[in-house]
Amino acid sequence: MDPTPALAEIVASLARVRVLCVGDVMLDRFVRGDVERISPEAPIPIVRVRDERAMLGGAGNVVRNIVALGGRCAFMAVIGEDRAGAEIGGLLGDEHKVDSFIGIQPNRRTSVKTRFFAGSQQLLRADDETIAPLDPYDADRLLGDVRSQITTVGALVLSDYGKGVLDGPVAASLIAMGRTQNLPVIVDPKGRDFTRYRGATVLTPNRKELAEATGLPTGTDDEVVTACRQVIARCGVDTVLATRSQDGMTLVGADGSVLHLPAEAREVYDVSGAGDTVVATLAAALAGGAPLAVACRLANLAAGIVVGRVGTAAVPAADLMAAVHQEEVSARDSKIVGAEDAREVVDKWRRHGLRIGFTNGCFDLLHPGHVSLLRQARAACDRLVVGLNSDASVRRLKGDSRPVQDETARAIVLASLADVDLVAVFGEDTPLGLITTLLPDVLVKGADYTVDTVVGSDVVLTNGGRVLLADLKAGFSTTSTIARLHGGSRRSGDTL
């Protein structure tokens, strides 16, 4: 069975994680109203304000997302001694799962981004802020706060919005601390010089940031991979996760690995803060022990949710769990194919060096004998294809009273099993045509057969494959189960 933890298990584990986040906090202010006329003073719309609200932005939005997922957070940032800074302090105070260590610089203007909306249409954004590195005293105080918390967390996030908190030696010192503690260090970068993040576990640039940092095009999959590899080689980071809007995400590792994840959003209303959601979900999942590729899948799902909402939204754990369940349903349904589609899928697997296994049957009423055979078959290969007799095929083999369940129901049940990677329905009496098309590396049947009597064994053996006769689980068969349901008795020798 696949040892990768289920996404649902990872989402459930997020309530037990604690993440340390350091970066540029800001106040995101949203002004909403209606546009009914154009100003007589200039060709601009007049917004009649209906609503105004403020929320944590920048690194603060990363914190909001970690908490929304159920996690806890230690948060280090710097604000000004002003009204916006006081608002940020109040908003952080409302987050009971956040331990805040916020420095105050009297001469600093807290970053405020004010967005004006008419309906769902953004009209204007106005920024009010100071962009300057921390003075040595504030930098040392911030690093001291990090030292006091870093042994109590499962991941470290650097959320760099280019406002100065992570300038100078601060970022390098933080990354060194994280790696000393064997923590995953996730950096949301800013600017053209990614060498400042040397030693990070994951960089998460968007497409534009990646292009600016490398001077390379980032329009296609191959171009993105090339740019990511340049960052890895030049900057000494372990991996780069490039976020690509409608084209999804691409994860590239220093080991040469590449993973493309398609975009999950059905409708996009607002991309504000989507990168923060990716970083937060990635960090929380890694803090919970998820493998990097799995954490990226979860982050991709979360991003698909958040861009469907207006404003810098956070994704609650319940919404992410619902998306996970929907993905599992879609993945299950995509496992059910015809012979031609099966060949395309198998060819793709082969190009990745995977060993293909094959077994077949009617699988009318699934029982422990079926499960045992499928488990043994999956253990002998990397991907298991199950050939499923169509309804017409079953009737010819078993009689007009069979199958009990139609082929759609039987295929759905099989596709729901973790040991089954693909279900291919065939209409012939035997799977010989399907076996000849797919040319599996391992052909599996029950031990009540001999190698010579297994349909397709000659094809597989001639092609360099092997035949596996799986141990049978005594006392289980579909035919005897049906007989008992009708008041009959179990018949010895009943088969699948």
UniProtKB/Swiss-Prot annotation:
Pathway where this protein functions: Nucleotide-sugar biosynthesis; ADP-L-glycero-beta-D-manno-heptose biosynthesis; ADP-L-glycero-beta-D-manno-heptose from D-glycero-beta-D-manno-heptose 7-phosphate: step 1/4; Nucleotide-sugar biosynthesis; ADP-L-glycero-beta-D-manno-heptose biosynthesis; ADP-L-glycero-beta-D-manno-heptose from D-glycero-beta-D-manno-heptose 7-phosphate: step 3/4
GO cellular component, one term: cytosol
GO biological process: ADP-L-glycero-beta-D-manno-heptose biosynthetic process
Protein family: In the N-terminal section; belongs to the carbohydrate kinase PfkB family. In the C-terminal section; belongs to the cytidylyltransferase family.
Biological source species: Rhodospirillum rubrum (strain ATCC 11170 / ATH 1.1.1 / DSM 467 / LMG 4362 / NCIMB 8255 / S1)
Subunit composition and interactions: Homodimer.
A Pfam family assignment: CTP_transf_like
Chain segments annotated as coiled-coil in the UniProt record: none
MF annotations from Gene Ontology: ATP binding; heptose 7-phosphate kinase activity; heptose-1-phosphate adenylyltransferase activity; phosphotransferase activity, alcohol group as acceptor
Listed EC numbers: 2.7.1.167, 2.7.7.70
Class of this enzyme: transferase
Catalytic activity: D-glycero-beta-D-manno-heptose 7-phosphate + ATP = D-glycero-beta-D-manno-heptose 1,7-bisphosphate + ADP + H(+); D-glycero-beta-D-manno-heptose 1-phosphate + ATP + H(+) = ADP-D-glycero-beta-D-manno-heptose + diphosphate
Residues engaged in binding ATP: N206, R207, K208, E209
CDD domains registered for this protein in UniProt: RfaE_like
Name of the protein: Bifunctional protein HldE
